[in-house]
C-alpha cells in the first residue's frame, strides 16, 4: 500500500514506514502497487498522480474530524487525526498550527513558511533581499539587517507556536518541522503524522464507520 | 521648508506640521519652496523628487545615531531620533521595530507589513487568497481560513511588538501605525516621528555638530 499527501509544492509518499517526496514533474511510475490512497490540496499535482496511478483513491471524502472550523484543509485534517491530542505544526510553504484535545479540533491558524518570509521581504525592497540567518539569536535585539529580517520571521513563528501550545504536547512535521522543533523542549518531530491520520481514516473505513 | 521621507511605496511630505503622501508617478511641482530636505530608501523615487525639486538636499550624510547596528536604514535612523526613548514601530510595506534608550539605539527588527502577509499567502496557494480580517479576535483560536490567516499575521506582529517593548513607551507611525496602535494601551500614534528626527538632524547641523 502506498500513501500520498499532495502539498502545494511536493508530493509526499509513505510506504511501510518510509517517507519520501517528489516534485510533480519528476513523478514516475514506481513499482506495481495494489492500493494507492491520497489526499491533495493541489489539483494539478493530483491529476499528475492519477496519470501514474489511475486507480489511486482520494481519501478526502472519507476523512471526518470533530471540529467547528469551516473549510479545514484535508492535509490539516489528516495531521490532526494523526496526533489526536496536542498541537500539530506542519511547516512547509505555509505553516499551519492546529490544536487538538481528545480527538476534537479546537481551531488553528496559518502563517507564511520560512522561505515565504524571505521572498515576501525581497518583494518589498531589494535592500531586504537577504538569505535568512537560521542561527539568529532570538534573545538579543538584532544588530544588522540580515539578523533583523531573520529574527522578525523566526521569532514570530516560534512565539506564535509557543503561545498556542501552553502545556500541550507539540508535534512538528513538514520540510521545516525539524528546524522549528529544536526551539522547543520535548517537541516531537515526525514526518509521518499526516500519513498516520490517513491510516486512521483507512481503519475507520474498514470498521465501516465512514 | 519642506521635508520628504521617501519610502518603498510612497513619498511622505511634511510642511508646517502637516503630513501627506504621494505616489512617485503622481508627484507634481508644488509651490515655490526655498528649502527642501529629504531622506530616501528608494533611489528611483529620490530621482523623481530631484526632478521636481532639483535643489533638495539629502539629509542622510548628516544623520548620526548612536548604535552598534550595521546598515540601519536612514528612515529608521530618523524615526529613532524622533523618539529618543522608547520603541518606535514604522508600519508600512515592511514593519520596522527599533528600541531606543536615552538617545542610544539598542537594536531592532523587520517584519513584512500587513499587506505583504496577504500577498505572500496568496502566492503560496489560491486557497489562501483571502482579504485579511482586520477585526479578527486574537484571544480565541480561529475557526475558518480567513481568520486563520488574519490571526497568523496580525497576532504575530502584535506579539513581536509586545515582546520588544516591555515597559517602554510605544510609538507608532506609518500607514498601518494607527491600526496597530489600538492593540496597545498608552501607545502613541504620530505620523510625524520620522520628520521630527529629520528636524532634529537639521538642528544639529545648524548647531555645527555635524
Curated annotation (Swiss-Prot), chains A, B:
Signal peptide boundaries: none
Residues that, per the record, bind substrate: 69, 73-76, 145
Compartmental location: Cytoplasm
Cofactor binding, per record: A monovalent cation. Ammonium or potassium.
Entry binding sites for ATP: 5-12, 93
Residues noted as binding K(+) in the record, renumbered to the chain: 90
EC number from the UniProt entry: 2.7.1.33
Active-site residue numbers: 75
Gene Ontology annotations for the cellular component aspect, listed alphabetically: cytoplasm
Keyword Translocase in record: no
GO terms, biological process: coenzyme A biosynthetic process
Pathway recorded for this protein: Cofactor biosynthesis; coenzyme A biosynthesis; CoA from (R)-pantothenate: step 1/5
Keywords: ATP-binding, Coenzyme A biosynthesis, Cytoplasm, Kinase, Metal-binding, Nucleotide-binding, Potassium, Transferase
Top-level taxon of the source organism: Bacteria
Cofactors: NH4(+); K(+)
Gene Ontology MF annotations: ATP binding; metal ion binding; pantothenate kinase activity
Subunit structure of this chain's protein: Homodimer.
Family per similarity comment: Belongs to the type III pantothenate kinase family.
PANTHER family the UniProt entry points to: TYPE III PANTOTHENATE KINASE
Protein name: Type III pantothenate kinase
Organism of derivation: Wolinella succinogenes (strain ATCC 29543 / DSM 1740 / CCUG 13145 / JCM 31913 / LMG 7466 / NCTC 11488 / FDC 602W)
Phylogenetic placement of the source organism: Bacteria, Pseudomonadati, Campylobacterota, Epsilonproteobacteria, Campylobacterales
